[in-house]
Amino acid sequence: MKISGVDIRPGNILEYEGGLWRAAKIQHTQPGKGGAYMQVEMKNLIDGRKTNVRFRSAETVERVRLDTKDFQYLFADGDMLTFMDKETYEQISLPKDLLGDAVAFLQDGMDVVMELYEEKPISVQLPEQVEAEIVEADAVVKGQTASSSYKPAILDNGVRVMVPPHITAGTRIIVDVNTQEYVKRAD
């Protein structure tokens, strides 16, 4: 579906110069001289490249709709991850780098949403928050309790996060997958 350059919104998938791009940030600009344009920061869904493009209001761009399907993560085999379609039970293997940093939070049996373009996997969306266990936490430094201070801790998946002083090793916490930050203590 063709849309005007000024109708682009963050999260839109665009077909641009033969590739699939996700609009990350947009800025609408109306200079005093000349026509209005939309400054769009885009990320390539295939290879992860980023680019900034100006779209004038008269320009049109192809907006792509991706199909989404529910999958379940099964196991890792070297650099490949195996997922199972929850409807047809078919298995599919994808390279680890398709998930980026989020691969550390992948857990056996985790439900994920896969985005497909023409039946080809483009990206894998993990749940926004996952539960993890602290395996190592630094001691609290005395005298730092006046302001809200955080201390470094290492999760069971090897990821380093900053946690409040009351969190100790062995505590289960909820972590935001995208920002890799502490959210709250797990119940």
Curated annotation (Swiss-Prot):
Query: What's a Gene Ontology MF term here?
Result: translation elongation factor activity
GO process annotations (BP): peptide biosynthetic process
Coarse class of the protein's main subcellular location: cytoplasm
Q: Please give the coiled-coil regions recorded for this protein.
A: none
Q: Which pathway does the protein contribute to?
A: Protein biosynthesis; polypeptide chain elongation
Q: Could you confirm whether the keyword Transmembrane helix appears in this record?
A: no
**Localization of this protein:** Cytoplasm
One Gene Ontology cellular component term attached to this UniProt record is:
cytoplasm
Matching entries from InterPro entries are given as: Elong-fact-P_C, NA-bd_OB-fold, Rib_uL2_dom2, Transl_elong_fac_P/YeiP, Transl_elong_KOW-like, Transl_elong_P/YeiP_cen, Transl_elong_P/YeiP_CS, Transl_elongation_fac_P
Q: In terms of domain of life, where is this protein from?
A: Bacteria
| Keyword terms | Cytoplasm, Elongation factor, Protein biosynthesis
The answer to whether UniProt assigns keyword Cytoplasm to this entry is: yes
**Its biological function?**
Involved in peptide bond synthesis. Stimulates efficient translation and peptide-bond synthesis on native or reconstituted 70S ribosomes in vitro. Probably functions indirectly by altering the affinity of the ribosome for aminoacyl-tRNA, thus increasing their reactivity as acceptors for peptidyl transferase.
* Entry similarity comment: Belongs to the elongation factor P family.
Entries under PANTHER family matching the protein? ELONGATION FACTOR P, TRANSLATION ELONGATION FACTOR KOW-LIKE DOMAIN-CONTAINING PROTEIN
Recorded protein name is: Elongation factor P
